């Protein structure tokens, strides 16, 4: 089986993909930003032509990390840890940070919560270099990407409901979503016509085990090491647009990371299972693959994952308790092993302590206490 691997050698080049993707359509000026990104010069889908390739090796382009919070509630300590690791990793490599507000879902379209997120990041001292950008302003780019996939015959309408998927007792992918077995992949015209009485979702075809090509995705995570997933058996055809018209997370983040020149994605290990799908989309759309680094989750003493819904150690409570960002970050650094003790430290002061070797020691989730 042919494998698609995350790039290992990079050279600086100009990311002109947003203009290529848009074709002759009208695209908002903010979306069409030419950003310097690192791309694998040996990748088969490099976005520039061979004539544009440099004749001499180019210096590695600067690291570009990102914050990508969803304004669905106040940040909790786990969100702070994720943003802190992304910031420290980029800054320790002399890189920059892009802030993107992921507000595609209606429940996330709350300007007051987005404003609170921005205020909390500023209070923590986790400054960013570009943004904030809002996904609800970037729908034209997602539509263009989906159109390319449709024109290539890679998508199909899916009329399955959640209840039907769960009733089928399908096994689940690593992120908890049912592995789709292709019930709507080859509908007859008559069945499709009858099913169209309700709005369909849109699914992306993945190679079947019989295709003998591009079925296996491999990449190396900075924390969890070598990863491998057979799309057909461990994932199945996946959503790129929901039945309510909302673009799926997998498509939106791939489009945004490429357009914003992101070269390093740092996020919680609960999203590790999403990475093969995103790499597959990058391959289909001819986009660069960033480096991925997934970090352990922070857990409450009773073993639960911290959540916005339960208001576990939310930042409002933490700001009131610790008083200063230095006190909070110093305590968090001690809890997670980034720095010794609980000495108050600013984000800038933690840069010298940060190491991915330390994060790798905590592959298991980390239990934190409010003490």
Region locations from a protein language model:
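Cationic, low-complexity basic patches in intrinsically disordered or flexible, solvent-exposed regions
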Residues: 20-21
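Non-catalytic terminal extensions that flank enzyme cores
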Residues: 26-73, 92, 97, 192, ...
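Low-acidity, Ser/Thr- and Arg-rich intrinsically disordered low-complexity segments
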Residues: 2-17, 26-28, 33
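Short, mixed-charge aromatic SLiMs
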Residues: 105-115, 300-304, 352-360
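Short, surface-exposed acidic
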Residues: 129-131, 289-292, 339-345
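Alpha-helix initiation and N-capping motif
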Residues: 114, 139, 162-165, 177, ...
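N-terminal Rossmann-like or analogous alpha/beta NTP/dinucleotide-binding catalytic cores
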Residues: 35, 40-173, 269-270, 274-287
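Active-site cores that bind ATP or allylic diphosphates and position pyrophosphate for catalysis
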Residues: 163-308, 314-319, 368-371
């Amino acid at each position: 089986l042919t494998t698609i691997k995350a790039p290992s050698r990079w050279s600086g080049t100009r990311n002109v993909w947003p203009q290529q993707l848009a074709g002759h359509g009208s695209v908002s000026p903010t979306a069409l930003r030419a950003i310097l990104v690192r791309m694998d010069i040996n990748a088969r889908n490099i976005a520039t032509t061979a004539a544009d390739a440099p004749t001499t090796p180019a210096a590695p382009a600067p690291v570009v990390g990102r914050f990508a919070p969803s304004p669905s509630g106040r940040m909790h300590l786990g969100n702070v840890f994720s943003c802190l690791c992304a910031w420290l990793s980029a800054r320790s490599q002399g890189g920059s940070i892009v802030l993107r507000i992921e507000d595609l879902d209606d429940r996330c379209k709350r300007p007051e919560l987005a404003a609170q997120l921005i205020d909390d990041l500023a209070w923590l001292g986790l400054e960013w270099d570009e943004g904030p950008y809002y996904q609800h302003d970037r729908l034209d780019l997602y539509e263009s990407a989906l159109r390319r996939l449709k024109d290539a015959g890679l998508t199909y309408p899916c009329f399955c409901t959640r209840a039907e998927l769960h009733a089928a007792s399908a096994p689940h992918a690593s992120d908890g979503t049912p592995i789709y077995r292709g019930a709507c992949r080859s509908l007859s015209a008559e069945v499709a016509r009858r099913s169209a009485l309700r709005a369909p979702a849109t699914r992306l075809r993945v190679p079947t085990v019989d295709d003998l090509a591009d079925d296996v995705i491999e990449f190396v995570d900075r924390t969890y090491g070598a990863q491998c997933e057979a799309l057909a058996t461990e994932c199945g055809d996946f959503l790129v647009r929901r039945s309510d018209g909302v673009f799926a997370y997998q498509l939106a983040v791939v489009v945004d990371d490429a357009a914003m020149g992101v070269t390093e994605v740092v996020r919680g290990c609960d999203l590790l299972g999403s990475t093969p799908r995103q790499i597959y989309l990058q391959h289909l759309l001819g986009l660069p693959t960033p480096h991925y680094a997934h970090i352990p989750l922070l857990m409450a003493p009773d073993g639960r994952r911290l959540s916005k819904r339960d208001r576990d150690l939310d930042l409002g409570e933490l700001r009131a308790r610790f008083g200063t960002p230095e006190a909070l970050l110093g305590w968090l650094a001690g809890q997670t092993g980034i720095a010794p003790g609980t000495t108050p430290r600013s984000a800038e002061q933690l840069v010298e302590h940060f190491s991915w070797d330390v994060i790798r020691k905590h592959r298991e989730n980390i239990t934190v206490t409010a003490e």
